Amino acid sequence: MFNFHQEAPFDHREVTSSSLLQGTLFDLFSASLRVFSQNLTTFILDAYVDATLFWPSIHESRAMPSWPSLKKLKISFNPVAPSGTWYFVGTPKDEEDTQFMQHGNRDTLDPFLIAFAKATQQMPVLESFMLECEIGYEVGFFELSYYAPGVKADWSLDWGDEDAATVRRLYYTVGDVWRPDAFVEETLRDVGRERHGPELIERFLGHRSWSSQSAWSWF
C-alpha cells in the first residue's frame, strides 16, 4: 500500500497549478508507479495521479503494460490532475459556494477512465477494484467498483447484502449527470467475464458523502 495523499483544494474557486516537470507532457510519478505495480498482487494507492498510472502516454516508449498477478486494486485519486486541471466541473450556486465541482469533466476524466478501462483488460485474475475520488465534504465521492463472485464489497448496500451473489458486481457512484462513455462501460462489464461467466449485477448508486446520514455513506 502506498499513500502519497495530497489534500484537494477545499475551495473549488482556487486556481490550481501544474506539478509536471518543465518540458514534460505527462506525470513521471504516475508512469513510474505503473511500471512498478505490474509485479504486485495487491495495489492500494492514495495519490495525485494522471492516466499514465494505467496506460503509457503516446510520448512514452514503453511496451503494453500487464498485471498478470494483480487481484486487488484500490486507487484513491485527487480531483485535480498533476497538470493542474480538474477532473470535475460544476457551476457555483452563488458567490459563497466553495464546493461546486461535481460532474465528470469529459476533457480530463474520460481519458483517465479510458486508460483505467484499458488497464483492466490486462488484469486477468482481478478480483476487485475501487477507483474513487473525494471531490468535497458536501459533494461527496466519485466511485467505480467491481467485485468477483464471493468477494465482499467495501461497504454495505442500503437495499441488502449482495456479497453472497454468485455473479460479478459492478457499481457506479457518479452523480446524476455524468455517465461513462461506451468504451469504458463495455470494457468494465468485461472484467472477470472470462473467468466467471457473462452474468453481471450493474448498479448506479446514490450519493455518498461524509455529511450524509445514509448507511451507504460509510465503509
Pin down the residues of each PLM region.
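Leucine-rich repeat
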Residues: 1-219
